[in-house]
Structure formats: structure tokens, C-alpha cells
Amino acid sequence: MELLSTPHSIEINNITCDSFRISWAMEDSDLERVTHYFIDLNKKENKNSNKFKHRDVPTKLVAKAVPLPMTVRGHWFLSPRTEYSVAVQTAVKQSDGEYLVSGWSETVEFCTGDYAKEHLAQLQEKAEQIAGRMLRFSVFYRNHHKEYFQHARTHCGNVLQPYLKDNSGSHGSPTSGMLHGVFFSCNTEFNTGQPPQDSPYGRWRFQIPAQRLFNPSTNLYFADFYCMYTAYHYAILVLAPKGSLGDRFCRDRLPLLDIACNKFLTCSVEDGELIFRHAQDLILEIIYTEPVDLSLGTLGEISGHQLMSLSTADAKKDPSCKTCNISVGR
């Protein structure tokens, strides 16, 4: 049987967090003969390995020949924000069950995308299921080392400047390494209604009245839901003043929440004043997208311990947790 030509001119497009479309060129004489495609897909950082996050999944994918371009989809071997290399081979299945194969094409590289809004909406729905009842609170707070606040006073005009979010949480979160903001907490102890006296982030705490960051002029976005191999679950929310750079970033990427009616964090008018509530059963991580003036709040030392084991800095999400994972790339 006549040999097959080697595929060439590979094109990759329509890339998502767990799929891509691929096409290539081959000789006209092969178009009606080819019965199968072999696709060799490897993580770029380890091209010679067949190890993906789940074992025993081959990187050489076999597909029946279909008109090109074709979509390759699968959350079991594709992860978000991950660089891959891909090469293709065409084949004709013969009567004896063996394959006549072409040579391998050139190798091309691409990077998968972030979670889209519909994926984040699925995470949001999962988070809502365990959020629990809403508790009142009155302040947002940020813990850090004393030197951090001294630096803000001395070198930053008494202002906490936004910084780039780390890679904690879901690997596919569009905020990781992209969104600038200042991290705050708002969870309270159910028996006192006050912020806890322990913190993983430092013994010095800046507290600011909730209405300074969260009010009807602020948009609230859902950004992530994750855990770190423990029973605790975290939800990341973004507070962005309407029309700000942070707001424009989030508008196209994150689900927008109704500030007065959602399962995580609310601001509503009751008897003429703003009342704030947070979900009891989630640890909320709040990202405020603008600079925060220290003069708007108070700074003091907490009496509790610094619980480093609870820090979420660059924390990796547990990919096996059924509570906080969805069926797309982790």
C-alpha cells in the first residue's frame, strides 16, 4: 500500500481550559484513505514523560478520522493554564487490524486557558450549597507583620497598595497572577460576633469599617472556591468600586453577585442603615481592588496566635475533593 504523507502546518485555536481545536494539512491523495488520527499530547515542562495528573491515561490519543478542524476535549488529561506540546500522525487501519501510519508532524506548543464564566458559575453553585447561614459583621480586617504596615506608612503614603494575587486556589482561576488587590477577611466568631483573635498572616491587624469598602457603589464578584486537603473550604470574592480598573477586569471574567442577595457576602439597607452579613460555613477571602488608606481604619496587635498552618499563600487546591471541584480542568 502506498505510504502516507506526513501531516504538516498544524494550527491550534479555540483554546479553553480543557479543550482545543486542531487542524493540519496533508496530501489530497490521503484524505479519503486515512481512517484514524494519532495525537501525541505532552505537558511542555516534561515532554518525554507520559505522566498526567491521573495515572494510566495515555498521552497518545486515537481518534477516528473526521473533517478538520477537530476538537480535542478532556478534563482528565488537560489542565487550565498549562503549556502543552502536540504532534499528529495519520493512519489507515488495514484488514488485518494493523495500521499503516504516516510520519509524525512537527511539534507545536500552546497554553490552555482559564476557567470561563460558566465554569466559575458551577463553582459558585457548589459553594452556595455549603455556605450556611448568614452572620452579621461590621469590619473588614487584614493581618500582617508589623514591618508591612510600617512600610506602608513610611514609603507608600500611609496607603495599602494593591498587589498581584498569588496562585492559591483553583489552577484555572482567571484572577491568579492577573488581578491586583488588597486581601481582607471578614469572618467572625459565631459566639462573639467579632473577628477571631488568631491569624495565619501576622499579629498586627488593620480593621476598617465595612461600609468603607462595601456599599452600593461597589460591585461584588465570585472568583473561586477551593480547599487545601482539609475540612475547611474557602471562597474568594472580589470587591471593586464600579467603573474602576478592577471592576473592568472582573466584568468580563467573573460572575457578578447581587450585593443585597447572595449566599456569601451581603450589604443591605435596613431601617436606614447599611447592614453587612457573611456566610458562616465558608472562610471568605476578600480582594479589594483599590488602594486603602490606613487613616480610614485602626491598627493594633491581636492577642491570639499566628496559625501558620492555616495560611493560604500559594495554596494548592485538593483536586480530589468532590465538594469544590467541577468536571473541567482542575
UniProtKB/Swiss-Prot annotation:
CDD domains, sorted: FN3
Record-linked InterPro entries: FN3_dom (IPR003961), FN3_sf (IPR036116), Ig-like_fold (IPR013783), PHYHIP/PHYHIPL (IPR042868), PHYIP/PHIPL_C (IPR045545)
Primary gene name: Phyhip
GO CC entries: cytoplasm
GO biological process, one term: protein localization
Lineage: Eukaryota, Metazoa, Chordata, Craniata, Vertebrata
Protein name, as recorded: Phytanoyl-CoA hydroxylase-interacting protein
Function noted in UniProt: Its interaction with PHYH suggests a role in the development of the central system.
Record bears the keyword Glycoprotein: yes
GO function terms (MF aspect): protein tyrosine kinase binding
Other known facts: Overexpression in heart induce atrial tachycardia and increased susceptibility to aconitine-induced arrhythmia, possibly due to altered expression of voltage-gated K(1+) channel and adrenergic beta1-receptor (ADRB1).
Known tissue expression: Highly expressed in the brain.
